[in-house]
From Swiss-Prot:
Belongs to the bacterial ribosomal protein bS20 family. It comes from Bartonella tribocorum (strain CIP 105476 / IBS 506). This is Small ribosomal subunit protein bS20. The gene is rpsT. The lineage of its organism: Bacteria, Pseudomonadati, Pseudomonadota, Alphaproteobacteria, Hyphomicrobiales. Pfam families: Ribosomal_S20p. SUPFAM superfamilies: Ribosomal protein S20.
Length: 88
């Protein structure tokens, strides 16, 4: 339980940031899901578009501190690998 006014404010700020981060993480997952759906459909063009939309979105989340940069790099790398396998 927060006892001081500054601690109470910190609790409020954490709750607000949690909501923002949750929304940003959800947005990244949505873009990833769109890529997966395009990949499952076998449509290379739509998969490339979905990948190009996904990459800046996850990097934006990295810059906001939602994901670690290595986590984002790993996800982008794995999706790029799957996209390349589709074209081969």
């Amino acid at each position: 339980m927060a006892n001081t006014p500054s601690a109470r404010k910190a609790v409020r700020k954490v709750a607000a940031r949690t909501q923002v981060n949750k929304a940003r993480r959800s947005r990244v997952r949505t873009f990833m899901r769109k890529f997966d759906d395009a990949l499952a459909g076998g449509d290379k063009a739509s998969a490339e578009i979905a990948f190009k939309n996904f990459e800046p979105e996850i990097m934006r989340a990295v810059s906001k501190g939602v994901f670690h940069k290595n986590t984002a790099a790993r996800k982008v790398s794995r999706l790029a690998k799957r996209l390349k396998a589709l074209s081969v």
